[in-house]
From Swiss-Prot:
NCBIfam families: sensory_box
Protein name: Phytochrome A
Lineage: Eukaryota, Viridiplantae, Streptophyta, Embryophyta, Tracheophyta
Quaternary structure annotation from Swiss-Prot or TrEMBL: Homodimer.
Organism this protein belongs to: Populus tremuloides
GO-annotated biological processes: detection of visible light; red, far-red light phototransduction; regulation of DNA-templated transcription
PTM section of the record: Contains one covalently linked phytochromobilin chromophore.
Similarity comment: family membership: Belongs to the phytochrome family.
Pfam families linked to this entry: GAF (PF01590), HATPase_c (PF02518), PAS (PF00989), PAS_2 (PF08446), PHY (PF00360)
CDD domains, per database record: PAS
Domain PAS, chain residue ranges per copy: 617-687, 750-821
Amino acid sequence: MSSSRPSHSSSNSARSRHSARIIAQTTVDAKLHADFEESGSSFDYSSSVRVTDSVGGDQPPRSDKVTTAYLHHIQKGKLIQPFGCLLALDEKTFRVVAYSENAPELLTMVSHAVPSVGEHPVLGIGTDIRTIFTAPSASALQKAMGFGDVSLLNPILVHCKTSGKPFYAIVHRVTGSLIIDFEPVKPYEVPMTAAGALQSYKLAAKAITRLQSLPSGSMERLCDTMVQEVFELTGYDRAMAYKFHDDDHGEVVSEVTKPGMEPYLGLHYPATDIPQASRFLFMKNKVRMIVDCHAKHVKVLQDEKLPFDLTLCGSTLRAPHSCHLQYMENMNSIASLVMAVVVNDGDEDGDTPDSANPQKRKRLWGLVVCHNTSPRFVPFPLRYACEFLAQVFAIHVNKELELENQIVEKNILRTQTLLCDMLMRDAPLGIVTQSPNIMDLVKCDGAVLFYRNKIWRLGITPSDLQLQDIAFWLSEYHMDSTGLSTDSLYDAGYPGALALGDVVCGMAAVRITSKDMLFWFRSQTAAEIRWGGAKHEPGEKDDGRRMHPRSSFKAFLEVVKTRSLPWKDYEMDAIHSLQLILRNTFKDIETMDVDTKTIHARLSDLKIEGMQELEAVTSEMVRLIETATVPILAVDVDGLVNGWNTKISELTGLLVDKAIGKHLLTLVEDSSVDIVKRMLFLALQGKEEQNIQFEIKTHGSKSECGPICLVVNACASRDLHENVVGVCFVGQDITGQKMVMDKFTRIEGDYKAIVQNRNPLIPPIFGTDEFGWCSEWNPAMTNLTGWKREEVLDKMLLGEVFGLNMACCRLKNQEAFVNLGVVLNTAMTGQESEKVSFGFFARTGKYVECLLCVSKKLDREGAVTGVFCFLQLASQELQQALHVQRLSEQTALKRLKALAYLKKQIWNPLSGIIFSGKMMEGTELGAEQKELLHTSAQCQCQLSKILDDSDLDSIIEGYLDLEMVEFTLREYYGCYQSSHDEKHEKGIPIINDALKMAETLYGDSIRLQQVLADFCRCQLILTPSGGLLTVSASFFQRPVGAILFILVHSGKLRIRHLGAGIPEALVDQMYGEDTGASVEGISLVISRKLVKLMNGDVRYMREAGKSSFIISVELAGGHKSQKRA
């Protein structure tokens, strides 16, 4: 298949190609079926290759009589398998309009074990079905006919009136009729006493639990687990997972067999082996069983007065086609069970939860297939359980596919970024001469750049002469397009395709200019296919005419011998993106310099906007937290409470000022200490837990009411560098609900007074009986959903109350429906279930999001008699607070990116300045010039150190390494004296104690220089014009080193009140007593932490007319000092 196009929507192009392929394949299927019916046992299976080739290419197939007859045969076949019988009823009269020939014998035959009373009922056209079943059975069937989606009740247990034999009735609707399959309940079976899916779910509980416990990231492990579980659940000799590829051919990707059986793992087979019509039926009926391929089929007799032929497509008894039976016999498979794996179509877009049709487009990903070497019957309840298991498997497959697509797209974006970088350095040859190159952009065997009449080749490619011939062919036959992609140059019409051999079959080409092009090549598909099945023995001869897995594999290789793997849409998107990049590069190749001034101006604007936005968001968030109607508290990294809003203060009776500073573990009940300790530990590691329940103590007048029960979500608070600096807990008070549940568990059966109570503390509650019928629906649920109690009682909870199409409360998608079934089933089997997210559309159309808590309902003997479901709703304030929090995080991330960019851009000119300084050191300079150069070098070193400080937490926590050197303070005097504009603008002199400055010391001189400069700047800003700044040093020696006192005085202050100097709030920030530190406050905090790393500390002293920073550090004396001593 080839595609010649300048650009296309990926989803639309894929969908249109897929539709065309289905139509073409259906025509092939029809021709093969007709050939088989005509040839019978002499059918040559290898003809599938010839038929495929005759319809191949891009020519649209014609809809002829053969195709029409084939589709009619598929849909209107009148044969069933003999393991059961079939009746079709008129919905209005309950009279039979069609029946299988074996129905009278199975349903009306007299049993000698049951005494006969009166005449035996006769079954035929026009018979009232209520006359051949017992009264309860007839009533159950009559009730089923009144259901909108009657399949929700399957299977219905019925008993024949004459024989008393039990049957499972499996009901489905077709146009104007109700079709019922009757399957006998085997003597060894324990018949299900109730209808509905919930009972069947129990059979697959273990398998579902195992699937859900698997970590994501491995499709192979997921398939292996599914196949193993199905193998154990069904008891067949072989279980396999089939995957359909993009071109509709299939592959066995996982397999489990009994010992001694020939493996089929790795087998590929042509698309014709599973016809498109069969795939369509698998989309409708998710499970298909063949009990015995040798069994004689039973005819279905239809009322001649019916104006149309009945379709049996939805029947569980529908007979398989003769060609499929022949295939099964040849592979020694007598019985089979097939489950469809239906996933979301990844090409579908535009679906939203609020759209009129919330269902996404679906596609058949593959099949889970079981084979048996002897006849095997699986009861309908177990088949239903397998269907549900396949639905859960499909959800996980869908998630793995989404994860794979994200990884692929991420890798493509990364490679594109690297290619862009190469183009900036060496355009355009960098994409073929450096690594990574264009072969890393998409999966291929070779790539070529055709640029300025020269050729650069990578990997396996055609020769230069062949490449020129391909380029000429493209310009001759595809001159109007900017590119071509095909999985078969032969099918695309390239005359020299056969001469290229197996090495080059598929090609993607894009035109950059009228003369320059890029090519990617792929070898034939067969080169990448390796069958993992039984090896071919030298003496064994294959008969390609027989329908058999080995023949399928051989036929598949024949079909794909001139084809490569198809080019996926995301790969073509990546190729077209590179094409556009190259075009722009060629246009701007002489003007590649970027206007950095514009970028810096934009970043500056972004920084200002980000600050204003962050401040606004922060103020709003603080207001919301304080006024929220849900309890919110926060702790720092030590577990000490630093946030306690009004609501939690009201609930606990503990005032804010009393709570601040207390350890969280001292405020919770002893029974909850371990839970909170674990949650706090994980949150500080960045692992945020959801829906954690614990009890917190009450105080004062509230202590008499007992502890408060909270369900909280832990949210790690992070700084600009994504380091965790605390934990915020957003809670929901469920004390009232817990009291209800505690009381419920203590009451023996009489719970109506609680459930139907209109007290606003009672949460929304609904429940089911053991058979899945809705048995409870309290007033809170009525208020929430808009559906009254009498409107939902005695409806199937799964399907009628909560479902997809005509349900009262419509769910978002199939995945939500399956997940609800899993949760209910888990509770029904007696297992403890966790709270899960749940959402549905209320009667008004509003989408309700909540938490669902499911509890089993027990009788006096402890047996499960149903489930109770409690809903917890998030308040409007909480939702708004979370929204504001997300905005805050996004703003912080934007600022962090801008900061990272600025730091990177500063490094380049700084390196240039350092280099220039080193070059000047080799020139003849005067003493004053040398001093200035030395000062400049020290300032550059300080700036370099600061740029390397990417992790401020390591400084704050004391994990920074100091670089120890000998120095004198005099050397660094110029650094902090001349580096402040305020000194010159205000005319403030800095007086130094020159004598003490000459002392030789040993320590981290650059960090000490940073500290001095920071504290000087802080004082200079707040010192009025004409003031004075004094820096003095004094020493006294100890055996372990020297202690340095530096006093920074601000004299002649013109402030009229005592205590003049820096604001008290800034001092608090320096000591870490104010969590909302400003930029100046953060700078002082870092400087103080650096001093503490030098075994010192900082004090701030206010005196009359002046104030001082007193900095003490412990430094060793240098060699000169030691000599003097």
